[in-house]
Amino acid sequence: MIDLGISKIALIGAVALIVIGPEKLPRLARTVGTLLGKAQRYVNDVKQEVNRSMELDEFKKMKESVEDAARDVENSIRTGASDFEKSWSETTGSTSSDALPGFEAFPEYRNPKKKWRLKRGATPQWFKARSGIRTKAQSGAARVARFRPQPSRKA
């Protein structure tokens, strides 16, 4: 960067005072300060963006290396399983696929279904009554109509 010492800054200030004048110098100094601040923030933003992109590239490389390692492990497991399958078929005289049909693929994940109705029905009635759980649902309008005082009829 530019090497600015106190003597150079004082010289620049004196020249600016002579050229610009004492009336406009404070306004110019504020403007220069705000512009330098904006430039500094812009440079910091650019640095942060460059650092983020570099980290993103590093993460991508790391992800690729982990995926490659996972593929290598999967391939080694498959080759080991196929070698075991061959040796098993040689010793027993039959393949495991003949003995267990339909079990070649991995089992599919099924999301366990929540049994909230069963849990709700398992709560005792005395507990529901004491804790204030409503057992009979009623709409808001029906509740208002039920508890609204009836107008007295004049004959």
UniProtKB/Swiss-Prot annotation:
Residue spans crossing the bilayer = 1-21
Question: Which GO cellular component terms, listed alphabetically, does the Swiss-Prot or TrEMBL entry include?
Answer: TAT protein transport complex
A molecular function (GO) held by this record is:
protein transmembrane transporter activity
Q: How does it sit in the membrane?
A: Single-pass membrane protein
Do the record's keywords include Zinc-finger? no
Query: Does Transmembrane count among this protein's keywords?
Result: yes
InterPro entries on file: TatA/B/E, TatB
UniProt keyword annotations, A-Z: Cell inner membrane, Cell membrane, Membrane, Protein transport, Translocation, Transmembrane, Transmembrane helix, Transport
This protein's name: Sec-independent protein translocase protein TatB
- Species of origin reads Polaromonas naphthalenivorans (strain CJ2)
Tell me the gene name.
Answer: tatB
